[in-house]
């Protein structure tokens, strides 16, 4: 999260300014993670028309429909929050809210996530269905213990998968085997998605032989490619529709500023995105949302200043960290030992430090 944000924010802003200059009426549909934070940076520091997308909410919506045995189009989920920090607070089956039925049924709840993430009684206490990333807030000690037990990290496993993929693709393409190359890539996607959260939840591995089979990624009804096409189709006016996206709040969530980027349902039509006003956030999550948004603003400031002190402050504010000494230690490990005493080295600093 924070390391990628520090490296990526300056690049994203630079690219957005180029779009702003060359095609000011264009929409920038941003896939870049951390999606909410990057969209916030672009929105705050350029005039580019930007919308951030993430497949996490719609994946959860489809999992709920599948667990209910109902068509996805008959199930409407009321979702609110920030990117990687959102909750479903209503599940409407043909217009009737059945979230209490969903929360009461362990068999349904077991099907909502690829790995066993949450104690079901916690979900019932909150009366909310969180997205998978809330695991790192609600079970952070367990996540860390599992990562230590596995002796690996998700990033390290993805790097290993990517290296293997590149080698396999090169061999296939050198042999003019394009069909095999596509099959290789599909197998890579299945291994990557099938192992998602296994390490943090179970000390599992992307290379375990017993990974659950995954649907064909090229025919799946969800995923980045699907939501990207749907959002772009809506923005052209071809298929106006409602999607959960990362957009300016514009009063939709009363707890945050109008220019804060929120992850919320929005009506999308030709050249317009209108967020749907949400009911007040449940008190159990208001503080978490506000503190995470404060972290996003602080991380953007650090990314642009190049200051290690600014970066440590952002990590201190982050609700999953919240301590100065570990923040400084992690930053030193990621970018080298540097006590700048407030000196601002500029946005290129983080990329140079990471490369070094």
Predicted regions and their residues:
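An acidic- and aromatic-residue-enriched active-site/binding cleft used to recognize and process polar
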Residues: 33-35, 55-56, 80-82
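Acidic, His- and aromatic-enriched active-site or binding-groove loops in soluble protein domains
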Residues: 48-64
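Long, compositionally biased stretches enriched for glycine and/or charged residues
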Residues: 69-356
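Soluble or luminal CAZymes and related metallo-dependent hydrolases
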Residues: 4-11, 56, 223, 291
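Short acidic, glycine/serine/threonine-rich loops at helix termini
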Residues: 39-44, 63-64, 89-91
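A structural signal for short, well-ordered beta-strand segments and their strand-loop junctions
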Residues: 28-32, 52-54, 244
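Beta-sheet entry/capping signal
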Residues: 26-28, 49-50, 76
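Rossmann-fold NAD(P)-binding glycine/threonine-rich loop
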Residues: 1-45
